[in-house]
Curated annotation (Swiss-Prot):
Domain CN hydrolase: 72-344
Enzyme active site: 119 (proton acceptor), 196 (proton donor), 233 (nucleophile)
Gene Ontology cellular component list: cytosol; extracellular exosome
Phenotype upon changing residue 13 to S: In UPB1D; strongly reduced activity; reduced formation of higher oligomers
Activity control, per UniProt: Strongly inhibited by 50 mM Zn(2+). Not inhibited by EDTA. Competitively inhibited by beta-alanine, 5-aminolevulinic acid (ALA), beta-aminoisobutyrate and 4-ureidobutyrate.
Disease connection: Beta-ureidopropionase deficiency: An inborn error of metabolism due to a defect in pyrimidine degradation. It is characterized by muscular hypotonia, dystonic movements, scoliosis, microcephaly and severe developmental delay. Patients show strongly elevated levels of N-carbamyl-beta-alanine and N-carbamyl-beta-aminoisobutyric acid in plasma, cerebrospinal fluid and urine.
Mutation effect (residue 208 to R): Loss of catalytic activity. Forms dimers, but no higher oligomers
Keyword Cell cycle: no
Keyword tags: Cytoplasm, Disease variant, Hydrolase, Phosphoprotein
Subcellular location: Cytoplasm
Record's protein name: Beta-ureidopropionase
Highest taxon listed in the record's lineage: Eukaryota
List of residues that carry Phosphoserine: 378
Length: 384
């Protein structure tokens, strides 16, 4: 399996394909070619100083007579943990806060309106270990924990909606842990939260040792810049999960994730892009970067030898549009900020062309699914 030595699919294609072939391959892989954003020089200089990649692309819609363009700039942040996983908890959280603050400041230079961080961004992705301490100490209140207060300041200072995925401790309901994304308005107020609907039980993804499936449904958040939803990590494998956010009105669905190359890298470029097409919305897939080493060996009942790391988190964050176009991915090996300029009018324009909502036959599937979940259900199989 390729680790950090392989930088990106795009770099590989550009290195080995002649230009005419490259253009055709990119047309198939990424849809229509997107215009690169002319981001401020000082933003690139700051990104260079802070050692993270900066890219920007624009998705454009057709000009309309009655509606003005509905422009929003989104920012996707991918990063590695700056300190070893065995560093003191408070030091790790502080280091991650500092790292994210530096990246958000560059996002503000680029005019970003909505920014989203990776899944469980304030900690190592330690759920592979099945150990409780010290990892549960990273859990915080979604409403007024230190990370939420930190993000509220960022949001207010930069007039930016912040999507902050954390490990939540719900003190109002028995100190239960949840995998949660907090949505903070550009006013600095906590707009609400959403929880991970689907919890993996595959390989080293031992997450159900810590938290279970979310209980908040599929909320969509009305922000000044558009309607957004957050489909956390493993939920991207479930088409109905994307569908319900779309049915509830989401125009942009963020997918903050933590996933490794051995398991999912061949799925990664497809799933969020397919969801954007199927649901007439923009999708934003975000993954962390690097290999995280833990103090103690662990196993996962899959026959593999005991080991001390989860695997390689391959980054490659990207944005996909309802017309099937998508940005190139960020690096597989570096921290990065991807800025995308979206015209939300494209959602309705594509809907009018393909009519997936109109032709979806939801009433038929609702009826059949209602029968399928009954204990006495028999599949409809026609036999001779």
């Amino acid at each position: 399996m390729a680790g950090a030595e392989w930088k990106s699919l795009e770099e590989c294609l550009e290195k080995h394909l002649p230009l005419p072939d490259l253009q055709e391959v990119k047309r198939v892989l990424y849809g229509k070619e997107l215009r690169k954003l002319d981001l401020p020089r000082e933003a690139f200089e700051a990104a260079s100083r802070e050692d993270f990649e900066l890219q920007g692309y624009a998705f454009e819609a057709a000009e309309e007579q009655l509606r003005r363009p509905r422009i929003v700039h989104v920012g996707l942040v991918q990063n590695r943990i700056p300190l070893p996983a065995n560093a003191p908890v408070a030091e790790q959280v502080s280091a991650l806060h500092r790292r994210i603050k530096a990246i958000v400041e560059v996002a503000a230079m680029c005019g970003v309106n909505i920014i989203c961080f990776q899944e469980a961004w304030t900690m190592p992705f330690a759920f592979c270990t099945r150990e409780k301490l010290p990892w549960t100490e990273f859990a915080e209140s979604a409403e007024d924990g230190p990370t939420t207060r930190f993000c509220q300041k960022l949001a207010k200072n930069h007039d930016m909606v912040v999507v902050s995925p954390i490990l939540e401790r719900d003190s109002e309901h028995g100190d239960v842990l949840w995998n949660t994304a907090v949505v903070i308005s550009n006013s600095g107020a906590v707009l609400g939260k959403t929880r991970k609907n689907h919890i993996p039980r595959v390989g080293d993804f031992n997450e159900s040792t810590y938290y279970m499936e979310g209980n908040l449904g599929h909320p969509v958040f009305q922000t000044q810049f558009g309607r957004i939803a957050v489909n956390i990590c493993y939920g991207r494998h479930h088409p109905l999960n994307w569908l319900m956010y779309s049915i509830n009105g989401a125009e942009i669905i963020f997918n903050p994730s933590a996933t490794i190359g051995a398991l999912s890298e061949s799925l990664w470029p497809i799933e969020a892009r397919n969801a954007a097409i199927a649901n007439h919305c923009f999708t934003c897939a975000i993954n962390r970067v690097g290999t995280e080493h833990f103090p103690n060996e662990f196993t996962s009942g899959d026959g593999k030898k005991a080991h001390q790391d989860f695997g390689y988190f391959y980054g490659s964050s990207y944005v996909a549009a309802p017309d099937s176009s998508r940005t190139p991915g960020l690096s597989r090996s570096r921290d990065g900020l991807l800025v995308a300029k979206l015209d939300l009018n494209l959602c309705q324009q594509v809907n009018d062309v393909w009519n997936f909502k109109m032709t979806g036959r939801y009433e038929m599937y609702a009826r059949e699914l209602a029968e399928a979940v009954k204990s006495n259900y028999s599949p409809t199989i026609v036999k001779e």
